[in-house]
Structure formats: C-alpha cells, structure tokens
C-alpha cells in the first residue's frame, strides 16, 4: 500500500493484450485509447510471486484522464519518477522511461 502504480491490470480469458489495455485504461482512467504499441516486457520476481508486465506506449487517446477507481492521478516527468514510491517491478519501466527522455550524448550541439 501507499505506492504509486502505472495504470493497467490483468488480461482476461480470451482477451488479447491490446484489448485488455483499452479496457483497463477506460475502466481506470476514463480514456479511449486510439493508437498504442507494445514497448517492453518486464518480468519481476517477488518473494511470493512473479509478475509479467506488458508495457505499451499510448500515442493517442480520447477523453481526459481521471482516477475512476478512487485512486489519485498525477502526470510526472520521467526524470522526476525516481522521487516517487513505486513497486519494485516498476523500476525497469522507470529506468527505461528516464533513458528515453534523457537528452542523447549524440544530440546536435
């Protein structure tokens, strides 16, 4: 408890990951995903279970995101995510987001 989490949930029987993404983001945030693509897979072993996370990039959606299940909602810049408390399984996602958002050493000067 008391940790921040990225929106998402479980894939239901007979449901594709893409359909689950759209359903979960509608249920949790009230948005209708228009375009999204798979981005990364995370496997994390806790002491009592192993979780597998399919992480997607949502490029466009309709609606205004709001916490529809009683949860708080915050838009956070990737560089600031390290200051927030997340479950251990989300660390790989935060590291990847931070790396993608960081300026490249090869950027034009």
Residue spans for each PLM region:
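NUDIX/MutT-family hydrolases
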Residues: 55-57, 65-97
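A structural signal for well-ordered alpha-helical scaffolds and beta->alpha junctions
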Residues: 18, 49, 87-90
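Active-site-adjacent beta-strand/loop module that shapes the phosphate/pyrophosphate-binding cleft
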Residues: 32-33, 41-65, 72-74
